[in-house]
Amino acid sequence: MSINIKAVTDDNRAAILDLHVSQNQLSYIESTKVCLEDAKECHYYKPVGLYYEGDLVGFAMYGLFPEYDEDNKNGRVWLDRFFIDERYQGKGLGKKMLKALIQHLAELYKCKRIYLSIFENNIHAIRLYQRFGFQFNGELDFNGEKVMVKEL
């Protein structure tokens, strides 16, 4: 099983821009076009393509943001955007990619926690995150989404 997390570059940008979620998921996450624009405006964001067996199957965006965190004085590590392309959903890739992303972020940032935010009606995603140990911490982000945190 080959999983790779690759930065968005000129070589894969067009393919990344072609990724999309299903129609019923559009209200939960921004398009890759919007994500890449956000990353251009905010240097904390690191957009990446998610590859399985050489195929681009998803997208994520993460970063170390300069908010106070009791265990990391440099800030909080956020998994800000994450999705599997509609064409690859229902094949267990969400679990595989989330596991790889958690490991990647833990190694990259040497962090003790990973944060994310989610709309409370995104039940499928909440269940996935809970299976991987993410729990609601009582906070809301600036968009009113509920914050979840995973202790590493």
Swiss-Prot record:
Pathway: Amine and polyamine degradation; spermine degradation; Amine and polyamine degradation; spermidine degradation. Residues 3-152 form the N-acetyltransferase domain. Its EC number is 2.3.1.57. It catalyses: an alkane-alpha,omega-diamine + acetyl-CoA = an N-acetylalkane-alpha,omega-diamine + CoA + H(+); spermine + acetyl-CoA = N(1)-acetylspermine + CoA + H(+); spermidine + acetyl-CoA = N(1)-acetylspermidine + CoA + H(+). Putrescine and N(8)-acetylspermidine are competitive inhibitors of spermidine acetylation. Keywords: Acyltransferase, Transferase. Acetyl-CoA binds at residues 82-84, 89-95, 122-131. It comes from the Bacteria. This is Spermine/spermidine N(1)-acetyltransferase. The lineage of its organism: Bacteria, Bacillati, Bacillota, Bacilli, Bacillales. The gene is bltD.
